[in-house]
Amino acid sequence: MNKKSIRDVDLKGKRVFCRVDFNVPMKEGKITDETRIRAALPTIQYLVEQGAKVILASHLGRPKGQAVEELRLTPVAARLGELLGKDVKKADEAFGPVAQEMVAAMNEGDVLVLENVRFYAGEEKNDAELAKEFAALADIFVNDAFGAAHRAHASTAGIADYLPAVSGLLMEKELEVLGKALSNPERPFTAIIGGAKVKDKIGVIRHLLDKVDNLIIGGGLAYTFVKALGHEIGLSLCEDDKIELAKEFMQLAKEKGVNFYMPVDVVITEEFSETATTKIVGIDSIPSNWEGVDIGPKTREIYADVIKNSKLVVWNGPMGVFEMTPFSQGTKAVGQALADAEGTYSVIGGGDSAAAVEKFGMADKMSHISTGGGASLEFMEGKELPGVVCLNDK
């Protein structure tokens, strides 16, 4: 990682505008999952210990450029105070006189949470005037919001035009882990790509075919590949306009010497419910009025074996509709194989895969769980992330 981090700069007495990702799920004013707040703690604690004046900025939900009462960061600031064991102040604005006054009153080691940056229309437009307003509050910009690093917004990228810009500890770790996976992976290197749609994963599959030894396919997107092999897939998800692309990917894998794994058997159902009747069939035997919803037991065994014999595994996207118990076994089996694998470094690419390992109680067995769904996806596509490009080089 050739970007400067908070370890590379003097922070004592400095006003630090630290962009974090506190976009946590809320229900009736209560935080239902505080993973993202906890993920930011090491950076915040480091800034506090170094004697910085810590000004935290984040978005929450999609207020679309106006103040929305239930999307204020007040409950987040309160919970952060409990987790840090110290008084955390909350501003009702993200810039301007009120915020400036509160910043002016800060002592070294104090923590202030600004209001939801997406209450302002200029945030998502990366408006230069708004970025200047944010910058006016501080001496240094720290980006620790990997989950929003693929967005060129005023508080994630624009502000870096006006202040020295460095990464926080979470951002640094994400870039280190994902960067090493793509540039200098331990081998055998396996990528597991699941999820519903081929179109969401085209860039990732294309980019990874040049990097991996094994590519494992699962989830709804697998049925487009099954159909590309000439099999009937009943009512399973299929993107007919991507069948040629699926054929191309399978051919590319062959040419590049990549082992390409797709389901050999699947779990099928006639209805989507917790009590659904399911059957297990080979991929060439899906009846016309049934739908594939998970990978079958033979496939799970094959995939687990590949995982066990890999040194590095990157997993992005579930193997089936894991939210429903009858269709969750494939995703669970992949998670279990990663949890049990010895000497395998496992990288979970945020989003649904992270939610799945969390749900099955396997999170602590994974080597690295990315905090950015969209950001880790774009990073794995080989794209430059605006929230990273804007940081100062070492």
UniProtKB/Swiss-Prot annotation:
Residues that hold ATP according to the record: K201, G292, E323, G350, G351, D352, S353
Q: Where in the cell is it found?
A: Cytoplasm
Tell me the Gene Ontology biological-process terms attached to this UniProt entry.
Answer: gluconeogenesis; glycolytic process
Pfam families this protein is in? PGK
Residues holding substrate: D21, F22, N23, R36, H59, L60, G61, R62, R118, R151
EC number(s) on file:
2.7.2.3
- The chain residues annotated with the modification Phosphoserine are S183
Keyword Cytoplasm annotated: yes
Q: Which UniProt keywords apply?
A: ATP-binding, Cytoplasm, Glycolysis, Kinase, Nucleotide-binding, Phosphoprotein, Transferase
Q: Which GO terms describe its molecular function?
A: ADP binding; ATP binding; phosphoglycerate kinase activity
One Gene Ontology cellular component annotation held by this UniProt entry: cytosol
User: Gene3D superfamilies attached here?
Assistant: Phosphoglycerate kinase, N-terminal domain (3.40.50.1260)
This protein's superkingdom? Bacteria
Instruction: Report the residues modified as Phosphothreonine.
Output: T299
**Which reaction equations make up its catalytic activity?**
(2R)-3-phosphoglycerate + ATP = (2R)-3-phospho-glyceroyl phosphate + ADP
Q: By its UniProt entry, which InterPro entries does this protein fall under?
A: Phosphoglycerate_kinase, Phosphoglycerate_kinase_CS, Phosphoglycerate_kinase_N, Phosphoglycerate_kinase_sf
* Pathway in which the depicted protein is active: Carbohydrate degradation; glycolysis; pyruvate from D-glyceraldehyde 3-phosphate: step 2/5
Q: What PANTHER family does the record point to?
A: PHOSPHOGLYCERATE KINASE, PHOSPHOGLYCERATE KINASE 1, CHLOROPLASTIC-RELATED
Subunit record text = Monomer.
Q: Which family does it belong to?
A: Belongs to the phosphoglycerate kinase family.
Protein name in UniProt: Phosphoglycerate kinase
Q: Which organism is it from?
A: Bacillus thuringiensis subsp. konkukian (strain 97-27)
Source organism phylogeny: Bacteria, Bacillati, Bacillota, Bacilli, Bacillales
Gene symbol of the encoding locus = pgk
